[in-house]
Amino acid sequence: MRILSAAEIEELNVSENEIAVCALGAVILYLKDTQKKDEIEAPSELEMYDTEKYMKLDMSARRNLELTKSMMTGDKRHSLLWVIDKTKTAAGKRMIRSWLERPLMSIAKITKRQNAVGELCDNPILRDEIRQALTGVSDIERLLTRIVYSTANAKELKSLQSTLEKLPSIKAKLADSSSYLLKAVYNDIDLLEDIRSLIDSAIVDEPPFTVREGGMIKEGFDKDIDELKSIMNDGAGIIASIENEQRELTGIPKLKVGYNKVFGYYIEVTNSYKDLVPETYIRKQTLTNCERYITQELKDLEGKIIGAKERCIALEYQMLCKIRESISNEVKRLQKTARALATLDVLASLSEVAVNNNYVCPQITNDGTINIKDGRHPVVEALLEDTPFVPNDAKLDLNENRCEIITGPNMAGKSTYMRQIALITLLAQIGSFVPAKSAQIGIVDAIYTRVGASDDLATGQSTFMVEMNEVAEILKNATSRSLIILDEIGRGTSTFDGMSIARAVLEFVCKQKNARCEISFLRRIITSLLLWRGFLTELRIIQ
């Protein structure tokens, strides 16, 4: 395996980060083992993941909020991703999932996404044209990986060509865009005409599935391949042509060109004409009535005819390798265009969802206020179909509304309400519009959740132990900018002990961590306990 030089590591901007260098080495070693190659090319660029730039979402939050898969079914359906993913391309699906799992912390970046989504919302004709144009676009990133690792076949190259042919139309649609992000997409789309032209001129329209079948290279692209194909397709005609040519040159009317397994191709002349045989003929066999000769030209042709198919397949494969190498040299241009198309796909998807579901553009601030008017749970609303979702308000800030206590009976919607606030906050920070009449979202650095009850048989932990461990992690990691969702904590033990734990946790979250918190209780007695502590001024009770 090739070792990266200090200069290469420096170019990747990771030389000063020892952990990043170690991680890069591990990735390259993994690629070597899985791709079965002795030498792995260094990556053209690396993106450093800065945790300070993205909202923190631990596995518990991802699971409880059902971001990418449903807890009930274990698949995408009925998750938040299922609601917002209306993308048309494979790369777009990967990117929208990445956005969902990494909400932004920068108001400027969020606003750029919002403006692009808003522009597409306001221009339905443009949005529909873009989504239609993206339909059928191949996965350039995956194709490029196969091309770089020399595993792409001719059909996959034609698939890439088909996608490149769509680029001029897609780019033209963005020419008059006004938002920063759509302008950036326009500038980043490289038409890649040289690559499209190369594939179009080299590969037949309907190539075979495997590269060892031959028949991949177009006629006229390579003269050696054309010659071999001509020999393969018209071997008998070529022999007849040589026979007529030699008759005219020698004046021997009964000259024949034949073939046997011993001598291969030969020229046969009867004894009555052997005096006319030119000196360039080489005698190979004497028979009773004739002589048999060979020429250098005939031997060369024999070699071409006999091995024409094998050599043609080999030459076509060599040519395919050269084409793949030429495309690999343009990897940065292809990657940039692929990312631009994926970004456009995601923005079009978010705008489609916003228009179809009556979402609004939230106001993003740094003051810690979460103020939602007529908010709706995006997944529950999608599942209700013809039944309207009953909207509700929410307000959290860093002052007297730091915490909301939600009380009510089982199946009253307490968990749905709390998850709704978290999901609206998360959607706002990925740059999406949100299901509400209006929304003001103060940037959240993390969402922590403690929802549901289950034990862990593998580690021998009871339901109560699992719950307390999760709460401890939240109390340790939460900051004043975090949003905490606590659903009936303390239910894994006795009523009195559970309320004591709940009160202590609530005081710590609001007084020590100063975090915004949503907490639900089945038992209304908790209100009187908090009132007794003089703590009610910092809470808003929802019943």
Question: PLM features: residue spans?
Answer:
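Amphipathic heptad-repeat alpha-helical coiled-coil/stalk segments that mediate oligomerization
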Residues: 1, 6, 55-59, 67, ...
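Charged catalytic and DNA/RNA-contacting regions of genome-maintenance
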Residues: 1-119, 132-135, 139-148, 152-244, ...
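Glycine- and acidic
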Residues: 8-13, 96-100, 120-126, 145, ...
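ATPase nucleotide-binding head domains, primarily ABC-like/P-loop NTPase cores
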Residues: 17, 88, 99, 270-299, ...
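Amphipathic alpha-helical transducer elements in NTP-driven molecular machines
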Residues: 17-25, 77-81, 90-93, 107, ...
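Amphipathic alpha-helical coiled-coil segments
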Residues: 110, 117, 127-133, 160, ...
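Amphipathic alpha-helical "coupling" segments that flank catalytic cores
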Residues: 118-124, 530-535
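Charged, surface-exposed helical/loop "interaction arms" that form contiguous linear patches used
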Residues: 149, 153, 163-166, 219-220, ...
